Amino acid sequence: MTSKTIFAQSSAKGKAGVAVFRISGSLSLLIVERLCGKFNIVPRKVYYRTIRCYATSQVIDKALIVYFKGEQSFTGEDVVEIHTHGSVAVAKMLTRSILECDGIRLAEPGEFAKRAFLNGKMDLTMAEGLVDLIESETLMQHKQAIRQMEGELEKLYSHWRGMLIKILSFIEGYIDFPDEEIPQSVLREAKSIINNLTREISNHLGDTRKGEVLRHGIVLAITGETNTGKSSLLNYLTMREAAIVSDIPGTTRDVIEAHLDIGGYPIIVRDTAGIRESDDPIEQEGIKRSLVAFKNSDIRILMIDATNINSVNQTIAHLLNDVYTIIVINKIDLVNYKYDSSILPCDKPIVAVSLLKQVGLDRLMSEIVSYAEKIADPGNVPAITRERYRNSLNKALELLQLVNLENDLVLAAEDLRMAIRYLEHITGKIKIDDILAEIFASFCIGK
């Protein structure tokens, strides 16, 4: 527990219908008394009161006030929420009036959540799930964040930790009494648990980073020769003029990026410079960046002009076999297009469209969503959402693979202890100040 009472605006700053302010700590009720006068406040009940500046008695606003008693609050401390009108002036006056009280200060970013963690209201994975929920922009990101915030990863890692503690207790018992012979049944059970955990952690790590990709966004790059309709496709996807569309080859010279929600998945679309032979050094640099963006993307859309399909250049031809590539044949309104397997591979989705006439685009969207599901949908299994989880799990796995119960039990016990610690690093059972500071600094103020 920390003695200092903290305060912050939890809602977004600026003009709004309602603003929410949060106070956490032992002085919460005293501050309410200073603002509203003394009254019998019952936990979890809403009160409508006039709030005034304590020093001048000037009316600040009429507000709703809710009190949450320590064990039933978000932070595990006494918490008061004040709901005012969303006026900038009200926010300034209320903040100034509250901070005039001794023993209270403005909260640091993430400090409310940090207190919730320190008071045992949530573990670190749940706290980070809360961050992901706040930052989620699509349905699938929201779904993953809710699962983590409700303790899906915490339950899994705590279960693994419990199994390792069980084995460690077996081993330490025989280390303390070396004259006792370990029964074969105990050895078999311990080996079985270690083998099962090794397999489960390996499978968990072999998730092709779906949780991390979903959290950060799926990168989709659009490339192709000049004037195939790449910028027109970007404009269609964004439903605005995000890129200049022109008949002049080489109009797009740099990578243009847009963040979209497609089928509930966060898609980062990158329109790239058209690929062709050019003597212009600026355009050459744009083409170079296009190929890098294409290579580093998760989903690739290769645009081909239906009126010029027989003259696909070699650079483009090499891109046809990339994983998760969708081949889009554009301008089918200008020619009677027919698929030719001698020109295009048959193992990739080939979508014939007319961006001008808005033909074939529903199927293109379906293909994008289909690839997004393969890349970033973890299904019903818990997903690793952060690199720090992955690093700790890899280290725990390496230690489990070293455990040999047939030889040195002291060494085996130490390997198990270290594996347990790495699992505890993830959930925060072992509190490392540097890790805590980094995690909670990423929160917004007021959370």
UniProtKB/Swiss-Prot annotation:
Enzyme class: hydrolase
Annotated Pfam families: MMR_HSR1, MnmE_helical, TrmE_N
Predominant location category: cytoplasm
A GO-annotated cellular component: cytoplasm
Subcellular location: Cytoplasm
Binding site residues for Mg(2+): 231, 252
Residue intervals of the TrmE-type G domain: 217-373
UniProt binding sites for K(+): 227, 246, 248, 251
Keywords carried by this UniProt record: Cytoplasm, GTP-binding, Hydrolase, Magnesium, Metal-binding, Nucleotide-binding, Potassium, tRNA processing
The protein's required cofactors: K(+)
BP terms from Gene Ontology: tRNA methylation; tRNA wobble uridine modification
Note on how the cofactor is bound: Binds 1 potassium ion per subunit.
Enzyme Commission number: 3.6.-.-
Role of this protein: Exhibits a very high intrinsic GTPase hydrolysis rate. Involved in the addition of a carboxymethylaminomethyl (cmnm) group at the wobble position (U34) of certain tRNAs, forming tRNA-cmnm(5)s(2)U34.
Subunit and partners: Homodimer. Heterotetramer of two MnmE and two MnmG subunits.
Descriptive protein name: tRNA modification GTPase MnmE
Organism name: Orientia tsutsugamushi (strain Boryong)
